[in-house]
């Protein structure tokens, strides 16, 4: 039902901009033909900036937000607050944010769960469409199998995170008519050759990609990809694969098989923060989030259980030490 630009606007980085800078950037994005704007309750003041920056162009834009609501009561409360922050009387797409484990999904889909609450919000006209997001493609596949009410699915997909679970999720989404929203198109900013990477993703039949943008040059380059959807040449594909091949050996694919850690260390979350801290726009945010954790990499007892469970045989203990160093250095 939603007619979206193939390149959307990922809303995390604008939390680093002033309100004036954010409004200018959002106006530029709309002017460049971008009409899908993704934000979240957990993205700092991103919702407020989008609400302010897009209010004059509201009819031209599709606003998508999300929250970690797990119950119907939380869903109602979160939607009400999001409406105020986004300065709108109806949100085009509201997603259940970051469903990563089976018990969470069960809670969300059960009577009294978040999905039931969002269905009620949809009937009341506060939201128009319902979606789900997460990093576990296999779990999201199960979610789509279990509920016909989910209209979109948002998940990481890129030339590194291109496994059988991601492909299966794309296939079932297409079969069911569920919209696919691709986050982490550059694997959290670590993949070089951004233009080639985005063009590769567009070749895979996805609906919209939402790279985070903070610069005018990024908007110009990314939006132009939607104007000329040309597949990668064999030479370009070879170049891209050569660039990412060294990264595949120690890249965390966020499958979560390593968890739970006996010591309560949020392994995957630390891996993600450690990758993102290299991006200047979110560097401080990542360090603050790491500092607020109850357990971090220093609490590792070297038991090795995580490495035994990792299907990619990653040296997780060494990776955590490196991420710890990156997240603490000035």
Labelled PLM ranges:
Residues 17-20, 31, 72-181, 186:
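Glycine/proline-rich, positively charged
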Residues 10, 40, 94-97, 133, ...:
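Conserved residues at the C-terminal ends of beta-strands
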Residues 35-40, 64-65, 128-132, 153-155, ...:
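Short catalytic-loop micro-motif centered on adjacent basic/acidic residues
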Residues 30, 34-35, 168-182, 186-330:
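Structured C-terminal cap/extension of enzyme domains
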Residues 1-61:
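N-terminal binding-site loop/beta-alpha segment at the start of enzyme catalytic domains
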Residues 9, 37, 50, 63, ...:
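Conserved, mostly hydrophobic/aromatic
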Residues 60-63, 149-157, 230-236:
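Short hydrophobic/aromatic-enriched beta-strand-loop microsegments
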């Amino acid at each position: 039902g939603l007619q979206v630009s193939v390149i959307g606007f990922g809303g995390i980085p604008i939390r680093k901009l002033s309100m004036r800078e954010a409004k200018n950037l959002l106006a530029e994005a709309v002017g460049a033909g971008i009409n899908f704007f993704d934000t979240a309750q957990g993205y700092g003041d991103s919702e407020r900036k989008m609400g302010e920056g897009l209010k004059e162009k509201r009819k031209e834009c599709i606003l998508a937000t999300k929250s970690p609501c797990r119950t119907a009561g939380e869903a109602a409360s979160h939607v009400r607050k999001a409406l105020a922050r986004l300065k709108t009387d109806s949100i085009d797409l509201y997603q259940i944010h970051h469903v990563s484990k089976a018990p969470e999904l069960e809670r969300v889909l059960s009577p009294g769960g978040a999905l039931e609450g969002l269905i009620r919000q949809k009937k009341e006209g506060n939201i128009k469409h319902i979606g789900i997001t997460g990093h576990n493609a296999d779990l999201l596949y199960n979610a789509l199998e279990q509920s016909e009410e989910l209209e979109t699915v948002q998940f990481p997909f890129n030339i590194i995170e291109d496994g059988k679970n991601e492909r299966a999720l794309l296939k079932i989404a297409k079969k069911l008519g569920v919209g696919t929203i691709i986050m982490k198109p550059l694997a959290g900013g670590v993949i070089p050759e951004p233009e080639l990477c985005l063009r590769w993703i567009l070749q895979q039949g996805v609906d919209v990609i939402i790279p985070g943008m903070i610069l005018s040059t990024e908007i110009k380059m990314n939006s132009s990809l939607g104007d000329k959807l040309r597949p990668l040449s064999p030479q370009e594909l070879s170049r891209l694969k050569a660039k990412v091949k060294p990264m595949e050996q120690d890249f965390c694919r966020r499958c979560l098989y390593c968890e739970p850690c006996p010591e309560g260390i949020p392994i995957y979350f630390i891996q993600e923060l450690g990758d993102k801290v290299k991006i200047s726009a979110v560097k401080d945010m990542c360090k603050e989030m790491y500092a607020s954790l109850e357990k971090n990499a220093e609490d590792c007892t070297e038991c090795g259980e995580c490495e035994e469970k990792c299907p990619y045989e990653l040296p997780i203990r060494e990776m955590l030490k490196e991420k710890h160093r990156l997240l603490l250095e000035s």
